[in-house]
Amino acid sequence: MKAADGVTLKATYYSPRKPGPGIVLLHQCNRDRKAWAAFAEAAAARGYHVIAPDFRGFGESQGERLDALPQQQASVVAEKWPGDVDAAYAWLVAQEGVDNERIAAAGASCGVNQAVLLARRHPQVRTVMLLSGPVTQPGREYLRESPWLPVLAAASRDDGNALETMRWTLGWSRNPSNRLVEYKAAGHGTEMFSEEKGLQPLMIDWLEAQLKRAPLERAPATTATPPSPVEVFWTTLTQPGGAAKARLLYEETRRTSRGVMLFPEAEANAYGYELLGRGDSAEAIIVFEMNVDAYPQSANTYDSLSDAYLAAGKRDEALRFAEKTLQVLVTDTTTPEVFKAMIRESAEKKIRELKKKGTDRRP
């Protein structure tokens, strides 16, 4: 296939040799399209037209190898992936026998977000299946605005925070059929197929119910479930001046529903810096304080809070949390070493500058 900018993409098409719905399978970033091969063959045998593309920079598609690029350049390449996915989608729906009104998208790891964004661009995508990956804000907003879209998510407890991320992502969707499949030690993304033999037939059964047999008419919004605590929290937080009210919701949830994760660390951190970018350091401080409370073992949360205090001109607090960052780094076992080095450099730089200029001792 050719992407819009002329890059040649490689994909595998699995035909059921009869009319049927279509599926787009999107691989994770430490694999290529072949990771979906067994599932694709099984789905084709059940009557589905399936396409599994390689993103540019992976497998047999053209483009610089993503793992050989600096992070900034890799991000530029990844921004082209939606166009690559659209090329695969367009090729699939052009095939004879494909039911263009019944399409599913499935993604693993970094393919998760691409699957949701494909559904956002093409309402013919009637369900998404997500394995062990995050969804960016545009995708989450689409899930919130599309209670008619059923979501199947799966992740394993041994895969870092993937399970909690999947649980949190489902909190943005109000479809009553949503399902989260939890495994104990199945690995990451499509690796789960080899460890949990029931996952593949479970996903195909999901397609039978939510794609092949489901009515084409979208369910009315009145059939949606009530907003989840996740949706209520983020709706509140992102309103102008909403951080203080969101903190009350967070504190109440901590008291009454300790198993509910209202925010992953990275998402709260990103939103806090978004507030700093707008010049709203007071709101950012509240967000970073919640993040410290929720993830006290992470050195990065303290470093971010230090940044917010510094932006607010509160130099004593900025110094205190920069020093706390270095203390927590010693016992932080979850942050990758490369990132820990960046956090250490950030904290040490602030400490040097703050001590050199003297802290603000005003009451």
Language-model regions, residue ranges each:
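Short beta-strand element of the alpha/beta-hydrolase
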Residues: 20-28
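Short beta-strand/loop motif that positions the catalytic acidic residue
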Residues: 147, 152-155
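Conserved alpha/beta-hydrolase
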Residues: 43-66
